From Swiss-Prot:
Organism field: Bacillus cereus (strain ATCC 14579 / DSM 31 / CCUG 7414 / JCM 2152 / NBRC 15305 / NCIMB 9373 / NCTC 2599 / NRRL B-3711)
UniProt name for this protein: N-acetylmuramic acid 6-phosphate etherase
Active site (record annotation): E82 (proton donor), E113
PANTHER family to which the protein is assigned, alphabetical: GLUCOKINASE REGULATORY PROTEIN
Span of domain SIS: 54-217
Subunit structure: Homodimer.
Pathway(s): Amino-sugar metabolism; N-acetylmuramate degradation
Amino acid sequence: MLENLSTEHRNEKTMNLDEMSIKEVLQSMNEEDRTVALAVEKEIEQIEKVVQTVIKSFEEEGRLIYIGAGTSGRLGILDAVECPPTFGTDDKMVQGFIAGGLKAFTKAVEGAEDREELAEEDLKSIGLNEKDTVIGIAASGRTPYVIGGLKYAQSVGASTASISCNKNAEISKYANLNVEVETGAEILTGSTRLKAGTAQKLVLNMISTASMIGVGKVYKNLMVDVQSTNEKLVERSKRIIVEATGASYEVAAEYYEKAERNVKAAIVMVLLQCEYGEALEKLKYAKGFVKKAL
């Protein structure tokens, strides 16, 4: 029942929210937001287990699939679509599904989150299999669409995890691993796009970033698999080569082109003074890890 969920409780500190000045509202929100990172910190051991599972999927050429409804679904899609430009993944490696389909990203689709079968249809459409990891996201921890997706994922042998913002969440029963970040009452009662949404975003940031580090998408703290899809990213790519190798900007730009705009290969070429083909071979042998290739 909704009344049992901490995310649905009234916040004792904001009973007079409608009487506060704008500054008081903002200060109240900021005060509540400060508690979110601390709530996430309590779940780091569970998040670590999720990351290890995702890395295993990636190593077996499996995928990471997020499912959610409303804000939770949008956050999953947001994390997924940032992976190709940031980490050089294809658009299949990390995917996000929202109840009601992509049109629900910009406009609510009434009743979609209440239908378990819609998630099964979505996951069947991509040929979900035992190599994949499915992460169900629901602030309340009880969304039928997410439960349906997790049930189907388990039925095909995929790894499963859940992210919710209430303890003993219903969706936790249907996942191998559970991340339950208890964010408590919102300043605006039941508006889980606030603290709960912030907590979910922090957890998703952790999962995708740490998983990509785990499969060699990062060298030192540089995103060496960045895709140069616009001028800003072309410049960033050259700067990454400068930072990684200590070469001048001019040398970095030269090797960037010699390496056919492959930042990893350019770094290996500069540091080992080798040709493009040899750099690719070294990276292949090192499974994409620049440090091992060197």
